[in-house]
Amino acid sequence: MKKILIVEGNLREENESFSKNGIQTHTESLKDSLSHFTNELSFDVVNPSSDQNIQLISDKLENYDGLIWGGSSLNIYDDTPEIKKQIEFMKDCQKKVKKILAICWGMQVAVTAAGGQVKKANNSHIGIANEIEVNENGIKHPLYINKDLSLIHI
């Protein structure tokens, strides 16, 4: 079984608000989505902005087969203690974890932690892909089992 660390980008207070209103947190959604396709993953969740035991997790990062750092409503341009904690934790992750999937906010934190700069877009963005075709290897992935591939092409 592969051990995956999921990093929560939102502040604890925001996640509590989501839960109180019947909305899944980003972390819960990631866990549910991945568990739907395989039962060969185990998950730990950490919130570097809120967790008091973050150093204990940092000391054990080598024990994870991979890491997923998801989204957040935070803004990388803000200079808050919570964001600084996330950037410092990402620096540890980049040194100790071989496989990192950074999604949206996670990518902004990864770029900043690596010394890069995230620039504001001139306008809003939406990730829309066109003319994507699933190749021979991709079609074997569990995501596409029993799927009508004519619906996948955009």
Question: Where are the language model's segments positioned?
Answer:
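Short, structurally constrained coil/turn elements
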Residues: 37-39, 112, 145
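N-terminal beta1-alpha1 cap of cysteine-dependent amidohydrolase-like domains
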Residues: 1-88, 92-96
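Gly/Ser/Thr-rich beta-alpha loop segments that engage phosphate groups in nucleotides
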Residues: 72-73, 104, 108, 117-118, ...
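Pocket-forming structural segment of enzyme catalytic cores
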Residues: 9, 114-154
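Catalytic nucleophile loop
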Residues: 94-114
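Class I S-adenosyl-L-methionine
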Residues: 31-35, 111, 133
